Amino acid sequence: MSDWDTNTIIGSRARAGGSGPRANVARSQGQINAARRQGLVVSVDKKYGSTNTRGDNEGQRLTKVDRETDIVKPKKLDPNVGRAISRARTDKKMSQKDLATKINEKPTVVNDYEAARAIPNQQVLSKLERALGVKLRGNNIGSPLGAPKKK
């Protein structure tokens, strides 16, 4: 037999005649375990790459803290931010509970942010900014939040 006699089929027709196991995507842990019990080849790969998600850099900071030898204090909220939150909330005649329900957080979270006890979370701060209409990050903390910039 020469090289010209053997057929190499690549692509979707490679399994002609139903020979060999088909590659499946297991959707649950039970399906993976069933395949392992049957002795099939199992490759568990996590799929990455969603379009509009950004990683939280808090994990990087925690890794840095783990590698440090001396004690590192956690980030705390600036007291000016807490005062700005409480001032804007009272100007809008809202209770802490009302503000918490408006931003879908617990009232204790709002209380911690107003008392400047909370570890700053960018998502919660942005929700508070939008609900109160006041800047809470960067320069000019407590100034009115401008309208979105026109493109």
Swiss-Prot record:
Residue ranges annotated for the HTH cro/C1-type domain, each copy included: 85-139
Spans annotated as Essential for TBP-binding? 41-119
Q: InterPro entries in the record, alphabetically?
A: Cro/C1-type_HTH, Lambda_DNA-bd_dom_sf, MBF1_N
The answer on whether this UniProt entry bears the keyword GTP-binding reads no
Mind telling me which GO cellular component terms the entry cites? cytoplasm; mitochondrion; nucleus
Primary localization: cytoplasm
Keyword check for DNA repair, yes or no: no
Question: Any idea which UniProt keywords this protein has?
Answer: Cytoplasm, DNA-binding, Nucleus, Phosphoprotein, Transcription, Transcription regulation
Q: Which GO terms describe its molecular function?
A: DNA binding; ribosome binding
Q: Which residues carry this modification: Phosphoserine?
A: 143
Query: Which residues fall under the DNA-binding region feature?
Result: 96-115
As for subcellular location, the record says: Cytoplasm; Nucleus
**What exactly does this protein do?**
Transcriptional coactivator that stimulates GCN4-dependent transcriptional activity by bridging the DNA-binding region of GCN4 and TBP (SPT15), thereby recruiting TBP to GCN4-bound promoters. Involved in induction of the ribosome quality control (RQC) pathway; a pathway that degrades nascent peptide chains during problematic translation. Required to prevent stalled ribosomes from frameshifting.
Tell me which PANTHER family the record gives. ENDOTHELIAL DIFFERENTIATION-RELATED FACTOR 1 (PTHR10245:SF15), ENDOTHELIAL DIFFERENTIATION-RELATED FACTOR 1 MULTIPROTEIN BRIDGING FACTOR 1 (PTHR10245)
Further information: Present with 47277 molecules/cell in log phase SD medium.
This protein's assembly is summarised as: Interacts with TBP and the transcription factor GCN4. Interacts with RPS3/us3.
Protein name (Swiss-Prot/TrEMBL): Multiprotein-bridging factor 1
Q: Which lineage do the record's taxonomy fields give for this organism?
A: Eukaryota, Fungi, Dikarya, Ascomycota, Saccharomycotina
